[in-house]
Amino acid sequence: MRGVSTPDRRPVLPGLALTLIAGLCLVPAAPAQEADPSEERIEELERRIEQLEERLEAEEDAEPEEALPDDSEADPTTAELERRLEILAAELERQRLGEAAVAAGEGEHGMGPAASKIYRTAEGLSIGGYGEMLYQAPDSTRDDGTPSGRGDELDFLRAVLYFGYKFNDRWLFNSEIELEHASTDQEGSASVEFAYVDWLARPAANARFGLVLVPMGFVNELHEPPIFLGARRPDVEQVIIPTTWRENGVGLFGDAGPFAYRTYLVNGLDASGFSARGLRGGRQKGSGAKAEDFAWVGRLDWVDTPGLLAGVSLYRGGSGQGLTDPAGRVIEATTTLWEGHVEWKKRGFELRGLAVRGEVDDVARLNAALGLEGEASVGEKLEGWYLQAGYDLAVPFAGLRGSLVPYLRLEAYDTQAAVPAGFAANPANDVESWTLGLAYKPIDQVVFKADFQDYDNEAGTGVDQVNVAVGYLF
């Protein structure tokens, strides 16, 4: 219940979260209770890191000298010393955490770090997972001054377990079982997010069979909380690309020179679930999926430059699934989505951008079949984009433990960028937003996030909100 004290009460939880994040950065490491079996290796790595740091300092303090033309034994450059230092630091972290630890960011074949554990397993069973708890505090009023009707919420959003089994070097099974909102009694659910069999033939060509994640954008495949910025996933990758999006299908994946690719044939979307708010309701999620119409999806990424990922993806297929208009004619509802994405990470900087556009055919007849009128039309065109930047303050400030990343994200999307003649677009579906926040990771596998989101739309009904989240993977 909100009263006059609401403005004073609202910042309490976010403020506590920011205080906790700041405090965790300064907490000293707990002393080890007993010697680790790898202690000698750890001491050796620490010694080598110290030597490299001393050489770097000496290199920076020294006067520049002209290199000799035949100086094949010249000392390594500063950049090379820094590269070696990063490699040793990563190895030291792995030794300290143990072999069972998942290195955040090290995914394989389009899967997240924890989801990729099975690929690093010699044989037999692999278990991993992730989870996230989210506090959301929306404003009590909309931009136009009317009540938002929304209250604060604290939700254990997801608890996920990965189960994989490697039969041999060629064949493996991988799956994700997701529990949402903690209890099925409170609008929660239990779902299979993916379940597939891989045939690992060769690096350039492998096969996948089963319930697969559609390879579009960043977050649909890589959605483990410690590996993306923001207490909440980007809106563009929920509204235009309907994350988490999975369908039944078969396909190929692999690495070809400097490129990585994935291409699948999957059951199509179900247009009877489309609405003015997008395609999200058309996902079939592998459950009794209608298969009157199929779709093709393909993705190609440049992965040959360290720290750089750049690529495109395309989805196209029928979504009618046997639906007919009032005249009895079959509706194809051919649906096309294409997107481009780029991510660059270097020395603490993290930049990410994505743009996506979608088209749906036969929308006038689809509206008639679904009984949609006025501003409720399905969009003939949908579009969105976002830009995101973050910087790890632990890079220049060596005293900070873990990772501390302030971030900013700008987004815009419109689920009714075009509608058929005789219909109107709802201005509330033309949205712009910005997100400003802070993410702290004491270790790679655990993250605390807090951010503020400002929402504006053409109807003036945007509702700003504060979010605080904790996430993990293993």
Enumerate the language-model features and the residues they cover.
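Active-site rim elements
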Residues: 239, 283-287, 375
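Loop-centered beta-sheet repeat module
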Residues: 273, 278-323
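N-terminal secretory signal peptides that target proteins for export/translocation
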Residues: 1-11
